């Protein structure tokens, strides 16, 4: 219902809805056609809150794949446990996390999508990110089954996606729990959208794409995923 307004902003660079939707489509097609992901499979996002992690969640949801959000500051043993327990079919990781986690990811044998800070940067900030990325590549080992995010979203491939999947699980979140080990929270597409509808009035976005909301909460947190990100985007705020 909205025009091609500004949808996201990263390092001062704005991106319109058309660009974000194109990247969602390209990723969804890659997951289905190249990685062979199917409805009910699990894919792990081991990332902070970034443009890439938000786009990837929607791409996975389009084809009925469950997103497992894992806190990027958790250690390699925890990541290994989550990959195994949830039977993840792949993982997305930020290049800055390579030092402590490349061993676990390579040992898992899972395909990996590597994200760079420069993916959605421009100008001097992009150049600065590129310098750091070059140093990382020169110092640390490489992922065995890796493709770079920036290469995936270059394509124009499209897929139909799953229809009427409201009651399917959309995401796994890891709660702290009151006792014992971390608990896995299951969120359906319906629960995400119903909560968004019930509280969407608190946003009151009057100028789509121009009024912005700063996202400081993580996606592995229910409030961060649903209220801070999904609700804001549904109300046409620029995030």
Cite the ranges covered by each PLM segment:
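Conserved AMP-binding/adenylation subdomain of ANL enzymes
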Residues: 64, 193-212, 220-239
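Short beta-strand->loop structural element characteristic of the AMP-binding/adenylate-forming
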Residues: 44-46, 53, 57, 61-94, ...
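Conserved AMP-binding/adenylate-forming core of the ANL superfamily
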Residues: 6-38, 44-50, 54-58, 75-80, ...
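Conserved AMP-binding A3 loop
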Residues: 16-18, 161-163, 170-197
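Conserved structural elements of the adenylate-forming
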Residues: 21-27, 152-156, 166, 185-206
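Conserved ATP-dependent adenylate/AMP-binding module captured primarily in the ANL superfamily
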Residues: 74-106, 195-214
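Conserved pre-ATP/AMP-binding loop-to-beta segment of ANL
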Residues: 125, 137-174, 181, 205-212
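N-lobe entry segment of adenylate-forming
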Residues: 1-34, 39, 119-143, 160-163
């Amino acid at each position: 219902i909205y025009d091609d307004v500004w949808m996201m902003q990263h390092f001062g660079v704005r991106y319109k809805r058309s660009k974000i939707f194109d990247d969602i489509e390209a990723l969804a097609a890659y997951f289905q056609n190249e990685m062979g992901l199917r409805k009910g499979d699990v894919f792990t996002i081991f990332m902070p809150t970034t443009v890439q992690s938000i786009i990837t969640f929607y791409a996975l949801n389009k084809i009925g794949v469950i997103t497992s959000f894992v806190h990027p500051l958790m250690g390699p043993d925890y990541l290994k446990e989550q990959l195994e327990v949830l039977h993840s079919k792949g993982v997305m990781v930020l290049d800055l996390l390579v030092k402590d986690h490349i061993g676990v990811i390579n040992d898992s044998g899972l395909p990996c999508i590597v994200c760079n800070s420069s993916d959605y940067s421009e100008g001097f900030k992009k150049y600065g990110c590129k310098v750091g990325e070059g140093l990382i590549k020169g110092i640390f080992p490489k992922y065995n089954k890796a493709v770079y995010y920036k290469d995936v979203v270059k394509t124009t491939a499209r897929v139909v996606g799953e229809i009427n999947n409201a009651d399917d699980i959309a995401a796994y979140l890891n709660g702290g729990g009151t006792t014992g080990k971390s608990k896995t929270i299951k969120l359906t597409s319906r629960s995400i959208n119903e909560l968004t509808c019930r509280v969407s009035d608190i946003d009151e976005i009057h100028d789509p794409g121009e009024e912005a909301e700063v996202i400081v909460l993580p996606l592995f947190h229910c409030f961060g995923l649903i209220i801070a990100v999904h609700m804001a985007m549904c109300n046409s705020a620029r995030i």
